[in-house]
Amino acid sequence: MRTLLAARERNPDAALAVAMFCYRARCEVGALAAVLGGMDSLVFTGGIGEHSAVIRQEICQGLEHLGVVLDTDANTAHAPIVSRRGVACVVRVVRTNEDLMVARHTRAVLQGRAGTNDRRQQCKSA
């Protein structure tokens, strides 16, 4: 995504790729909000969601009717809460360790525990 963002001013294909990524994310948020009957929180996580204020901004544009309104300064600073105060939907940025999660899931598969609740298994073995 960093490469696409850096190239989008001079490369229409890069600009289209970024625009489509954000559009599809907005579509998914809207679909989930419809199924859930609204939303009170939107969480950005992972590499792009955690580190790209530009992408968060572009995804959130057009979601104001769902109560999503970003605080530009908080978003740029990668604060834990990047929405304006008092809005209906709190927008959060949550740090993750994706590599650790992949490793844990891989270990569960290799140990034959795929699809089980790891915490429940850990409690039984304690």
What are these regions (language model features)?
Residues 1-17:
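A mobile "lid/hinge" subdomain adjacent to the ATP/sugar-phosphate binding pocket shared
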